[in-house]
Amino acid sequence: MSHISDLLRNHGVDLSWQESLYQDLHEHPELSGFETETSRTILSQLNRFDCEVISPVGGYGVIAIFRNGDHENHPVALMRADFDGLPVKETTGVPWASTRIRPLDGTNVPVMHACGHDMHTTALLGACALLDERRDAWQGTFIALFQPSEENARGANAMIADGLAQKIPRPDVCFSQHVVPGPAGAVMSRPGAALAACDSIDIRIRGRSAHGSMPHNSIDPTYVAAMIVVRLQGIVGREVSPEEFAVISVGTLQSGNSNNTIPSEARLVLNCRFYNDKVKKRIYRAIERVVKGECMASGIEHEPVIEYFAHGELTDNDVDVFAKVRPVFDEVFGPESVTADRWTASEDFPNIPLALNSPYLYWTIGATPAGDWARAVAADRVAQDVPANHMGDFLPDFEPTVKSATTAAAAAVLTYLGVRSHRKV
């Protein structure tokens, strides 16, 4: 058994407080950009540790820097956790379920930790406690970075814009993790592309309005938008190789507000995902061709407005970091350390190591009760029977999930900072 595996199985650190913390975070979620209470809770927890705390960073971001031993001659490792919630109505029925209603874009919405960011925060604070108490096991610098506003893809860039690189030592390696559907406690990692890159595309079509009884006097943007939606479905199926991955989803389609008026404008908002730039460029050329072609075919007199926004970088795990950390995961978790499938979701985490010029590894943690997962797999009903991220009934199985998430965070950091790790060269 390696020294890391032995330490993490017998660390002797009391982490029983994690459950009450998790339930408090879960019951009191906050939307992206409004994480005042959560930030205060994190700061309160960090007060227990021997670390330098920097806050606020990029809004409500919090950074804790732990230095130990001959830290100037040993590596710097950063572990990140996000902590914002979602405008989702909770249906879990647990005593600590969120009942919060908060304003968003002019309307009141329910708020829930439907993506597990409460678990990410709890686990990273647990890793902080473990590494703070077991300073005999490591040397170097450990940075715990708590990031707000992941769900709107603004938090990482906000921290970067607020001088993140000048506030912390440059990490030799960065880590992050995410809970997902899967057997609770499983630690799933892979080299290379792990999460998709993404963009959103806002398309506005300006036609000509007319009374509903006189469609011949109009240039109907609703009809044009409908034709665009239909034609978009053929791009992935007919212009992208089956060996490649791409998604084009129409998430918003808006036009008019009266049943007897043909409107003057229609709006579509697309979400696109991919694993490489070659595919991205191909589908974007095709989208613009389809939009402009349908407008031309219908006699639209105005050039369509096509705007790209909410870009998410590809999460592309460094192969050397993976090769170093994965054997440690295998030894610490045994059969629960498995190879991850690529995840088609996207993250803003890569912006941080890219800005810091650091290699990184991002892995996932299974959060579904083991029995529920096994039954769903056996019945080929995972999509139907297993609650997934962003659903109102998504609730990680606490004990195995928090244990693996806390341990994985500490294991990855100790791979670089453990007392038997290599010095900087």
Which residues are covered by each model-predicted region?
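General structural feature for long, well-ordered alpha-helical segments within catalytic domains
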Residues: 3, 14-21, 34, 38-45, ...
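Divalent metal-coordination and catalytic microenvironments
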Residues: 25, 64, 79, 117, ...
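Conserved hydrophobic/aromatic beta-strand scaffold that supports enzyme active sites
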Residues: 63-65, 202, 362
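Histidine/acidic-residue-rich, glycine-tolerant segments that coordinate divalent metal ions
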Residues: 86-88, 97-112, 118-119, 130-252, ...
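Metal-dependent amide/peptide-bond hydrolase catalytic core
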Residues: 223-425
